[in-house]
Amino acid sequence: MCIRDRREGATVEKGEEYSHKTPIVFYGSSIVHGVGAGKPSSNYPAIIGRRLDSDFINLGFAGAAKAEKAVMSYISLLTMSAFVYDYDHNAPSAEYLEKTHYDGYKTVRAKQPDLPIIMASKVDYYSNEAENEKRRLIIEESYKRGIAEGDKNLYFVDGRKIFDEDLRNESTQDGCHPNDVGYLAMAKAFGDIIEKLI
């Protein structure tokens, strides 16, 4: 949809087609959803969608992204050009994450053997460094295991490294959820990878 003007007599016309019609799918927490963004178009999936002129599906669930089998099975059936598996925050513990992260990835991979999959660890790494390091290592182990099993289209984004160190405090609204500064950094980290894949 394209709105040309808000004044009386304005028209609503069909928008231009995306260069990449097959959507990028993003799965994760309130951070994927965009809870800290200044406006709906400022979360990192939306920024990447504009940058790459690609359709996208935002499956960000505030407090509820737990990689349940039914959810991952549903995701595995979606038509997509790439899958961003930003699952970490909502796992209630590192132990839960360890039980579900790799299995969630394998559920999608089993249905879509050639799909680019990008795993990520949390960006608010320094909020609880000991716990978050456990989680980061679990996700990195899922990645390494997939690579060892021959997955040639699997990628890992280390959340510790996304925010500029000089702007770490300015990159979230509450020490956890990225604001527009943080989302720009996330969009660059993920977008630079996705741009080469779709």
Regions found by a protein language model. Name each.
Residues 1-3:
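Short, small-residue-biased leader/transition segments that mark boundaries at the very start
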Residues 21-42:
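Catalytic nucleophile-elbow at a beta strand-turn-alpha helix junction centered on a G-D-S/GDSL motif
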Residues 36, 40, 48, 65-111, ...:
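Oxyanion-hole/transition-state-stabilizing segment in secreted/luminal serine hydrolases
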Residues 44, 100-104, 135-142:
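A general structural detector for well-ordered alpha-helical segments in enzyme core domains, enriched
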Residues 45-57, 144:
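Short helix-loop-beta junction
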Residues 76, 126-198:
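Catalytic His-Asp segment of secreted/periplasmic serine-dependent ester chemistry enzymes
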Residues 112-117:
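A short helix->loop->beta-strand "cap" motif at the edges of active sites that frequently abuts
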